[in-house]
Design a protein with these regions (language model features):
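Polar, enzyme-active/binding microenvironments
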Residues: 38-64, 89-97
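C-terminal interaction-tip segments
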Residues: 1-33, 91-108
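Intrinsically disordered, low-complexity Pro/Gly/Ser/Thr-rich segments with frequent PxxP/GP/PP motifs
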Residues: 53-87
Length: 108
């Protein structure tokens, strides 16, 4: 089994929920860290979710405020394990307001 560290990014996330990362087939992924930066001119509320093929979708963050010009480092030593076809999603209450960085390790 190979372990590969990767960085996934998504710029200008807004009101429409965006898929930041979809786990490839035959892969398990460990989410090591998520950083959300507010690039808008005002504060905004963000959400992070996990969509699963089994329809057990969950919110990991919901309506968490990020002040103007600030960022939120989400995970702080915790890990989340994602399985094949799981999707990590992000949204905001303000259009084009969030840049997201996702640090992961894929196990193939």
């Amino acid at each position: 089994m190979a372990n590969t560290f990767k960085l996934k990014t998504k710029a200008n996330v807004g009101i429409t929920t965006q898929n930041v990362y979809v786990v490839p087939s035959a892969t398990t992924t460990v989410v090591i860290g998520i950083t959300l930066a507010n690039t808008s001119g005002a504060g905004c509320l963000v959400g992070v979710g996990i969509t699963r093929p089994s329809s057990d979708d969950v919110k990991v963050l919901k309506n968490v405020p990020i002040p103007q010009g600030s960022s939120l480092e989400f995970m702080s030593g915790n890990k989340v394990v994602l399985e094949a076809a799981d999707t990590l999603t992000i949204n905001s209450d303000t259009n084009n307001s969030i840049d997201a960085s996702l640090t992961i390790m894929e196990i193939t």
